Amino acid sequence: MVLLDPLANALSTIKNAEAIGKSSCIVRPASKNIGNVLKVMQDLGYIGDFEFIDDGKAGIYSVTLVGRINKCGAIKPRYSVGTGSFERWEKQFLPAKNFGALILTTSSGVMSQYEARDKKIGGQLLAYVY
């Protein structure tokens, strides 16, 4: 079976494990993009530590959950966001202002919308988490 969107699959795995109360989960296949999104989620405090494990194939991530995720998911299609249009997308994907975060990819790497707003750069939306 071919995965069409590994990022969406990874976030769905994390959301489902969080919903049933697990303390950790395994995300496969691993990629740099998924690792960067997990790093942003860790910096925001939504997940604990995560570790890359080489299984001889694509690799896997072992993610420690902390119980803070209500919902997370990938944003498809990957909408382009300018520096002044974050509020529009926050209203669409997040339940309230300053509750949760949008994760986007920019020319400076993967970051949250708060960091992108501070740096005054735009990018493409990857995911949301709250």
From Swiss-Prot:
| Any one biological process term the GO annotation gives | translation
One GO cellular component term noted in the UniProt record for this chain: ribonucleoprotein complex
The record's listing under InterPro entries reads: Ribosomal_uS8 (IPR000630), Ribosomal_uS8_CS (IPR047863), Ribosomal_uS8_sf (IPR035987)
**Record-linked Pfam families:** Ribosomal_S8 (PF00410)
**Alphabetical UniProt keywords:** Ribonucleoprotein, Ribosomal protein, RNA-binding, rRNA-binding
UniProt KW Ribonucleoprotein keyword: yes
Is rRNA-binding one of the keywords? yes
Q: Give a GO molecular function annotation for the protein.
A: structural constituent of ribosome
**UniProt family annotation:** Belongs to the universal ribosomal protein uS8 family.
The record describes the protein's role as: One of the primary rRNA binding proteins, it binds directly to 16S rRNA central domain where it helps coordinate assembly of the platform of the 30S subunit.
What do we know about how this protein assembles, alone or with others? Part of the 30S ribosomal subunit.
What protein name applies here?
A: Small ribosomal subunit protein uS8
- Name the encoding gene, please: rps8
